[in-house]
């Protein structure tokens, strides 16, 4: 028997986890046919795409992110510079064989690399960017990838053991609705020395050279009954060919006019790992 196509693999995975999915239009429970058509009782329907992704937006939405950005992000993340962060996340996950939702997953590399390190994990990535989800489905067939909006998410309540929110905007009300009892929200936010070598070269003596995410951390603490904060700080060597990719993938890089002048031998990753639970 030949290998299953990416689309067939996705259909199998959706069938196995269909109870997670709610219609983004009317919130009714979804079903899926053998042919890969997802539909609810009101007959709102959504097809699994050829590459295995699912488009679950109730209306079209624009994203500012390009295919080139996601290709750059894929290269940078898979170079290993975020491995320490990913391992720190894995160390905090308590549930056996967890179901994870990565909110704002982009091209999927963080979720895929985290799931690889956890026995029996099932990963679902959601992002408003169709380009990001197309890239994720192209790169990784082990996880499910959905174009969707967190403000109107296509999932039922109490569906996930872990919700990841990595360097991405959050919706804490929705996170708590989607979280299983005893589940964890794990959020990553930049700290003051994140990519400091880039900021020093590009934005010397300007407000962009330094910043703080103290308000984001405080809001997270206020949103959950139990929280924990861990600082992750390390510096890694940076290969020359990764520098333009790093500039392409980060919003900070978009504002640099003379990109060719940036020369980096190393880069600092400085993050807060926030863990929230409801008691």
Name the predicted role of every residue range.
Residues 2-63:
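N-terminal auxiliary segments of SAM/dcSAM-dependent transferases
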Residues 151-162:
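A short acidic, Gly/Pro-enriched loop at the edge of an enzyme's catalytic core
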Residues 62-84, 88:
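Class I SAM-dependent methyltransferase Rossmann-like catalytic core
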